[in-house]
Curated annotation (Swiss-Prot):
Gene for this chain: SPTSSA
Lumenal compartment spans: 30-34
Disease tied to this protein: Spastic paraplegia 90A, autosomal dominant: A form of spastic paraplegia, a neurodegenerative disorder characterized by a slow, gradual, progressive weakness and spasticity of the lower limbs. Rate of progression and the severity of symptoms are quite variable. Initial symptoms may include difficulty with balance, weakness and stiffness in the legs, muscle spasms, and dragging the toes when walking. In some forms of the disorder, bladder symptoms (such as incontinence) may appear, or weakness and stiffness may spread to other parts of the body.
Principal place of residence: endoplasmic reticulum
Species name: Homo sapiens (Human)
Protein name: Serine palmitoyltransferase small subunit A
Annotated consequence of substituting residue 28 to K: Within the serine palmitoyltransferase (SPT) complex, leads to a strong decrease in SPT catalytic activity with L-serine and palmitoyl-CoA as substrates
Site residues, Within the serine palmitoyltransferase (SPT) complex, defines the length of the acyl chain-binding pocket, determining the acyl-CoA substrate preference: 28
Molecular function GO labels: serine C-palmitoyltransferase activity
Amino acid sequence: MAGMALARAWKQMSWFYYQYLLVTALYMLEPWERTVFNSMLVSIVGMALYTGYVFMPQHIMAILHYFEIVQ
C-alpha cells in the first residue's frame, strides 16, 4: 500500500516537472543550459526569501507604528 502511494507521488512529481519544463520552455535547452537556468532561478528565489525573512519584520513594525496600532 505504501509502495503505491510512493509511486503515485513520484508520478505526480514527474508530471509537475514536465509541466515546469513546458511552461518555461526548458525542454528546448541542452542539459547544461537547463542546469544554469535552474541554478540561477533557485539562487534568485533563495535571495528573495532570505531578504523577505530579514527585512519584512522591520517593515511591518514601521507600518504598525505609522498607523499607531503599536506604540
